[in-house]
Amino acid sequence: MTTPPPAARLDVIALDCPDPAVMAAFYAAVLGTEIDEAESRDADWVQLQRPGGRAGGGVALAFQQVADHRPPQWPGAEHPQQLHLDLAVDDLEAGEAAVVALGARKHAVQPGDTFRVFLDPAGHPFCLVVG
């Protein structure tokens, strides 16, 4: 049995936020990449460079300005998160120190000991995992 060809490829993951430039600077520093000026349309959309470039199949991370942005609430369902990023690190303690120094806040709820939950500058939850 052969697998049919994909109907599409994952190209960009875009996060809504109040200030795309702030979010792009934060995640560029966390991920060790840069803003992709050619793909960043204006102040309303800022995109990071893709690992390996578009031809290399890399997925881009972008930030889109939304008026009256409300950060997701986790845990809870008042304004639930619909997506979160898991970012791999070699060492949780060192990773925590690095993301906090860059502007992340450690979430009060930590449901496990193999990963850590943080909030980015716009309040989106993300996790650091060893991997």
Predicted regions and their residues:
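Catalytic beta/alpha-barrel core
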Residues: D86-A88
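Generic beta-structure capping elements
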Residues: P51, Q64-D68, G131
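Core segments of cupin and vicinal oxygen chelate
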Residues: T2-A8, A14-L61, A94-A97, A101-A108, ...
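Short beta->alpha transition motifs characteristic of CBS
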Residues: Q110, L128-G131
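A short, acidic/glycine-rich surface segment
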Residues: D68-W74
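Short, solvent-exposed beta-strand edge segments and adjacent coil->beta transition regions
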Residues: A8-V12, P80-H84
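Short, acidic, Ser/Thr-enriched surface-loop or helix-capping motifs
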Residues: D120
